[in-house]
């Protein structure tokens, strides 16, 4: 083999051999087979019915919905999360195997929505309970937006490094806290503000001649009727 054949051999070898790392291979296998756990509590969850249909067909992305968190690596939260449901959501997330991802779908999941204005039992954003990878705003988001969020998550999985994700989760871990109500001093004493109440004059303050004159006029009126 002479020196002229070396470049041809190098080009042939480069076109025939795929060079990659175990990390890239792992990311490729995970982004092509996401198994989501659907956690829906409100109207945003209805949009998933359109995704299952033939028009959008989210099975082409390798999505296989699971009913058990131990078999899922993606959880899609849709709808309002209340204080009572917060421990259940955190428990489901902790039961999912690593690596795991979260998509927050809808305004109620991201910020609490319109229910967080006057409600004391609504969580103001699911990211206060579990780490969120992709935020999907809308009320409700369209099925096309859900597919776009899944596409962005696939791109994120393709370029992430597993060791760095584990390290960041250990440093920025979300701990659950019990919601406790503290009994404070009551501001209601049971006494009404006399200045705000209308007090009718008592009979002792009315002159006798006025009182008897009024009583006689009422009696004569009743007799006429």
Swiss-Prot record:
Task: Report the membrane topology from the UniProt record.
Answer: Peripheral membrane protein
Q: Name one GO biological process term.
A: electron transport coupled proton transport
One Pfam family assigned to this protein is Oxidored_q6
Q: Which InterPro entries match?
A: NADH_UbQ_OxRdtase-like_20kDa, NADH_UQ_OxRdtase_20Kd_su
What's in the keyword line of the UniProt record? 4Fe-4S, Chloroplast, Iron, Iron-sulfur, Membrane, Metal-binding, NAD, NADP, Plastid, Plastoquinone, Quinone, Thylakoid, Translocase, Transport
Its needed co-factors are: [4Fe-4S] cluster
- Write down the superkingdom of origin: Eukaryota
Catalysis performed (reactions):
a plastoquinone + NADH + (n+1) H(+)(in) = a plastoquinol + NAD(+) + n H(+)(out); a plastoquinone + NADPH + (n+1) H(+)(in) = a plastoquinol + NADP(+) + n H(+)(out)
PANTHER family in the cross-refs: NADH DEHYDROGENASE, NADH DEHYDROGENASE [UBIQUINONE] IRON-SULFUR PROTEIN 7, MITOCHONDRIAL
Similarity section = Belongs to the complex I 20 kDa subunit family.
What name goes with this protein? Answer: NAD(P)H-quinone oxidoreductase subunit K, chloroplastic
């Amino acid at each position: 083999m002479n020196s002229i054949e070396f470049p041809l051999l190098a080009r042939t070898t480069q076109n025939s051999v795929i060079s990659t790392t175990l990390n890239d291979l792992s990311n490729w296998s995970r982004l092509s087979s996401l198994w989501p756990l659907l956690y829906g509590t409100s109207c945003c969850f209805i949009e998933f019915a359109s995704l299952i249909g033939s028009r959008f067909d989210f099975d082409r992305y390798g999505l296989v919905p699971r009913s058990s968190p131990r078999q899922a690596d993606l959880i899609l939260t849709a709808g309002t999360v209340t204080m009572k449901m917060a421990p259940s959501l955190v428990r489901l997330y902790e039961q999912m195997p690593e690596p795991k991802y979260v998509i927050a779908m809808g305004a109620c999941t991201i910020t609490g929505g319109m229910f967080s204005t006057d409600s004391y039992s609504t969580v103001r954003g699911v990211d206060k309970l579990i780490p969120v990878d992709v935020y999907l705003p809308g009320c409700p988001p369209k099925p096309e937006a859900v597919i776009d969020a899944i596409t962005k998550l696939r791109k994120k999985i393709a370029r992430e490094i597993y060791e760095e994700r584990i390290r960041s989760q250990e440093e920025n871990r979300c701990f659950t806290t019990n919601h406790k109500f503290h009994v404070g001093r009551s501001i209601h004493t049971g006494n009404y503000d006399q200045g705000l109440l209308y007090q009718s004059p008592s009979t002792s303050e009315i002159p006798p001649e006025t009182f008897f004159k009024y009583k006689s006029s009422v009696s004569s009126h009743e007799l006429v009727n």
